[in-house]
Amino acid sequence: MKYLLLAVTTALAFLLAPSSQADPSHVTCYVTAESTGQRLAEAGTEDLVDSPSITEKQEYIFVDPSKTFQTILGIGGALTDASAETFYKLPKSKQREILKAYFDPKNGVGYSLGRTHIHSCDFSSESYTYVKDYDTNLDSFDISHDLKYRIPFIKAALATAGKDNFTLFASPWSPPAWMKDNTNMLHGGKLLPQYDDCWARYCCKFLQAYEQQGMHIWGMTVQNEPLAIQPWESCVFSAEDERDFVKNYLGPEIQKEGLNTKIMIWDHNRGLMYNYASAILDDPDAAKYVWGVAYHWYVNDSFENVKSVKEAYPEKHLLFTEGCNGPFDTSQLTNWIWGEKYATSMIHDFDNGVEGWTDWNVLLDEKGGPNHVQNYCFAPIHADTKTGKLFYMDSYYYIGHFSKFIRPGAKRIISSSSTDNLLTTAFINVDGTISIIVLNLTDQPENFNLWIHGKVAQNVSPAHSILTLVVS
């Protein structure tokens, strides 16, 4: 495998934070484009100037900052056992580079949202839990396993991002084997009813244990991919199962323990999300405990289902919690389609009301792991643990076009394209800067005018490119 070592000075020096002090009539363009060396590169500044009347002979991106929608929680990725273990196999200099690349808002892409898991998932080197078998009192509860790699990695990420600038949530892949009808953490199975209360208390123990380590878990999903029977850690919850577990056990237990943890349901693909979510949210005794609906991108796009959930339950929130490309194949590391898939999903998800967007593993090794069931996949950064070299996939830059310039607290605003060749979404940050994403999936460059309140700035979107236009 041939890896491209991207030094901090060359890979990240161009990542300059937008200034809230600049003249508000300026538009600064950042670009990542195929068949060029441009990766989140600053590509110049244009002035917004008074526009004559619009014409059908030109293309436009129309932006209206006066129309605001959802507030953004954050954008980021998953801090898994696999990411942490890979991280600590690297030289200290590479560890520092990764932390800066992901979590530094000025010199990196400023990840502000992270997911982790409750005991093991497939991207762990082994299956494990935090208690001894059949300890229903949970007296043996112990997170020592996580203290070796995962907790120090999360703490390092928080320190780089700034604790107040980073939101962390968690998901369980499976209860312990002895709580399930198949007596196995793997291959699906269901939580036995006699352990509903024990499992709810177990989840709260995890939240409290991480809090004691100085890591606040803002929220949790009830079950990762609750309808999937997988060769790795998995557990089946029907919509009715999840509704009753939240209503009778998890919600009351979190409340009883005085935790402010947000509960998210579903945490599976878009295709079935409306049917599953409605079965829970139509029950007021369950819905009162539910902050929102989490979902993934696998199987199909079905963006209309995201919109349907938001329209039907406008008081609830939406969070994208997992997406990745795979299976891992070294010959596909430079395939441009991976980055485009991220940007396409992110634009449609945000435009349909999602408040945060979380990639899967932030870091994997030269095999796309470690993974104890060989379910290897791609991550935005891969590390060769033998040589210490890092490989930045194009997806790192595509996600960075969002995470760096759309900060927590931003609000989505109107952004519409006059051409099918350009996809767009836009946000206004707390500091007043406006960030507009423009995605070109075609083989041809596209000239367009950025139009804001009667003023325009001319731009060009290269073939197979993503732009972030920062109006400041």
Model-predicted regions and their roles:
Residues K2-L16:
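Cleavable N-terminal signal peptides of Sec/SRP-targeted secreted and luminal proteins
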Residues Y3, F153, A463-S465:
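Short linear sequence signals and composition-biased patches located at protein termini or domain-edge surfaces
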Residues A11, D81-F87, F378-G388:
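Charged, low-complexity surface segments at secondary-structure and domain boundaries
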Residues L16-D23:
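Bacterial Sec-dependent signal peptides at the C-terminal "C-region" and cleavage site
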Residues D23-V63, L168-A170, R201-A209, Q213-W218, ...:
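Substrate-binding and catalytic surfaces of secreted/luminal carbohydrate-active proteins
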Residues S35, L40-I217, S238, N248:
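N-terminal catalytic cores of secreted or lumenal carbohydrate-active enzymes
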Residues D81-E85, P226-I229, G326-P327:
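A short, flexible beta-alpha/helix-coil linker loop
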Residues R115-D122, S171-P175, T221-E225, D267-R270, ...:
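Short, solvent-exposed turn/loop segments enriched in Gly/Ser/Thr/Pro and often Arg
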